[in-house]
Amino acid sequence: TYRYAFWILMAGLIFRAMPHMTLVSGYLQPFFAWNVWGILPTTIIVLVAINQPFTLWMLHSFFLNIPKDLDESAMCDGCNRFQAFRYVIIPIMWPGVITTGLFSFLLAYNDFTVTSMLLSDENETMIPAIASFLGTVQEEGKVMYAVAAVVSATAPLFFLVMFFQRQIVSGLTAGAVKG
């Protein structure tokens, strides 16, 4: 194990716990200066940067549960490090990777602050578009449109979770207990 791995993870989680408004406000001035505000790639980069500490923290707990003996025995059987990782470690890690990927996807999919601040109206994602159905103080909203949009936005997530249900359950239980 690395000497300062715990403190690096904690520093990353502290940044993850900060309000997104605080993190995104630092990006706005360079994005305007470089003329990359309002497009999807910059928003994707910011969402990856914000969700990366959570992803590393989850994967770290899964990696701690893999016995070191598996890696060593694969190398005794003639595998090099890459083959041992590919054929032994990845199949064991697959439920954890799927679970972490789905959690990260859900965090980015449901993000309102980052997408509403960094994207222009023509590149708007689903969550700010749904919020626009609710109206403002000056005009009445279309609440039934918002409800229909929420159901439409939730349906793909439901099917995605149902498709990966077995990996999610085994991934959640695998990273829960160290032993």
What is each model feature region?
Residues 1-179:
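A structural signal for multi-pass alpha-helical bundles of membrane permease subunits
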